[in-house]
Curated annotation (Swiss-Prot):
Sigma factors are initiation factors that promote the attachment of RNA polymerase to specific initiation sites and are then released. This sigma factor is responsible for the expression of sporulation specific genes. It is responsible for directing gene expression in the forespore compartment of developing cells of Bacillus. SUPFAM superfamilies: Sigma2 domain of RNA polymerase sigma factors (SSF88946), Sigma3 and sigma4 domains of RNA polymerase sigma factors (SSF88659). NCBIfam families: PRK05572.1 (NF004052), SigBFG (TIGR02980), sigma70-ECF (TIGR02937), spore_sigF (TIGR02885). Keywords: DNA-binding, Sigma factor, Sporulation, Transcription, Transcription regulation. InterPro entries: Cro/C1-type_HTH (IPR001387), RNA_pol_sigma-70_dom (IPR014284), RNA_pol_sigma-B/F/G (IPR014322), RNA_pol_sigma-F (IPR014236), RNA_pol_sigma70 (IPR000943), RNA_pol_sigma70_r2 (IPR007627), RNA_pol_sigma70_r3 (IPR007624), RNA_pol_sigma70_r4 (IPR007630). The keyword Transcription regulation applies. Disulfide bonds: none annotated. It comes from Priestia megaterium (Bacillus megaterium). The keyword Transcription applies. A motif (Polymerase core binding) lies at residues 61-74. Gene3D superfamilies: 1.20.120.1810, Winged helix-like DNA-binding domain superfamily/Winged helix DNA-binding domain (1.10.10.10). CDD domains: Sigma70_r4. Belongs to the sigma-70 factor family. This is RNA polymerase sigma-F factor.
Length: 253
């Protein structure tokens, strides 16, 4: 396990409202908030990776891809949803890994991240000697002509994850472990419940298209709005209505 992850092991875990506050700041361009979200959710990414361990891929490679899914979920999360971030993020991370496996041979993200991580490590050493202190993410990014996001992603992707039995979140004193998040408690897989396939079948064609574009094609609300010829606000309202309808359907099953 990475030294920094060990160091963070005994730190209190973020509650859902704290995560959402960080997401809000991140979506407004706060890089520190974005870095914190990634740091605090590394265990969540690793828990998802466990589902794909025996498919012939290196766990570290899948972890790197999962980090990309995590960052996408931060960017796309709608704070108006009455849903925990972890509930939204896990399917996004799973989807990113599944796409990587499906497109293997054409997408070489893991290799490029490893190469980038090596460059970043060397750059940090050089800048530390030059500045007499540890350089910031922005300084490393500027030195290598990268974006701050690329630097953070490469650094986090190379950090070793921790146990899936550790608590990820505590909601009103109720601890939630990684295993709780992804375990198959019934014959139906956890992700199938998140996808709500049966509930989707109850939607009309436009609603199905919105779900498909948002959650299977990773399109933003603005992109969906352009596709449907309506406003982003309308898409947001429709999406909330759809999610509520699907949730009710699941509760009745």
């Amino acid at each position: 396990m990475d030294v920094e992850v060990k160091k963070n092991k005994n730190e209190p875990y973020l509650k859902d409202h704290e995560v959402k506050d960080l997401i809000k700041r991140s979506q407004q361009g706060d890089q520190i908030a974005r870095d914190t979200i990634v740091q605090k959710n590394m265990r969540l990414v690793w828990s998802v990776v466990q589902r794909f361990i025996n498919r012939g891929y290196e766990p570290d490679d899948l972890f790197q891809i999962g980090c990309i899914g995590l960052l996408k979920s931060v960017d796309k999360f709608d704070l108006s949803y009455d849903v925990k971030f972890s509930t939204y993020a896990v399917p996004m991370i799973i989807g990113e890994i599944q796409r990587f496996i499906r497109d293997d041979g054409t997408v070489k993200v893991s290799r490029s991240l490893k190469e980038m991580s090596n460059k970043i490590r060397k750059a940090k050493d050089e800048l530390s000697k030059l500045l007499g202190r540890v350089p910031t993410v922005a300084e490393v990014a500027e030195h290598l002509d990268l974006t701050p996001e690329e630097v953070v992603l490469a650094q986090e992707a190379n950090r070793a994850p921790s146990s899936i039995h550790e608590t990820v979140y505590e909601n009103d004193g109720d601890p939630i472990t990684l295993l709780d998040q992804i375990a198959d408690h019934t014959e139906a897989k956890w992700f199938d419940k998140i996808a709500l396939k049966e509930a989707i079948e109850e939607l009309d064609e436009r609603e199905k298209l919105i779900v498909y574009l948002r959650y299977y094609k990773d399109q933003t609300q603005s992109e969906v709005a352009a596709r449907l010829g309506i406003s982003q606000v309308q898409v947001s309202r429709l999406e909330k209505k759809i999610l509520k309808q699907m949730k009710l359907h699941m509760n009745d099953t």
